């Protein structure tokens, strides 16, 4: 059995997440589970019924808190992948936790850790040795400066520049 991916609770963001997953070329099938999406293979309350046919699932909610909550529920049955667009750059020493979604042309630098269910937007840069918490949404063009910490559930505006030192002066 190959890898099959469910995109759960996707609302508007699901189409983009599907394109990111397709760019990776590692899923033989990608489907949606959502109460409001035309073409979804099922409703949210039925998500468990697709296991073991589908072995991977990821939440694609716009809201980081909701995304994190859904991924926590899903991990009881499914593998929660890290999705990264083929046009993103991720350092080999970076650590991306389950449920991360990295959009095109984003960069994750050396020694950085990206928390669970965090979205790194297109053209965003997480520089060296940063810690980005769980459930964050770094919108397009966000820059997280070297050795910064981004608190859990942070949501930025496009083009934001963040610096909160990991070390005390």
Q: PLM features: what roles do these ranges have?
A:
Residues 1-86:
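Terminal amphipathic alpha-helical/low-complexity segments used for targeting or macromolecular assembly
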């Amino acid at each position: 059995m190959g890898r099959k991916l469910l995109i759960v609770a996707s609302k508007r963001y699901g189409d983009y997440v599907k394109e990111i997953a397709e760019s990776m070329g590692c899923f033989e099938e990608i489907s949606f589970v959502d109460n409001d999406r035309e073409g979804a293979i099922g409703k949210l309350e039925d998500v468990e019924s697709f296991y073991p046919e589908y072995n991977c699932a990821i939440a694609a909610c716009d809201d980081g808190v909701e995304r994190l909550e859904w991924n926590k529920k899903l991990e009881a049955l499914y593998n929660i992948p890290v999705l990264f667009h083929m046009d993103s750059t991720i350092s080999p020493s970076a650590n991306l936790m389950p449920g991360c979604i990295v959009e095109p042309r984003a960069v994750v630098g050396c020694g950085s850790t990206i928390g669970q269910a965090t979205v790194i937007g297109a053209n965003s840069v997480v520089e060296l040795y940063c810690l980005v918490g769980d459930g964050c949404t770094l919108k397009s063009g966000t820059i997280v400066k070297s050795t910064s910490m981004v608190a859990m559930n942070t949501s930025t505006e496009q083009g934001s520049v963040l610096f909160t030192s990991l070390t005390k002066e």
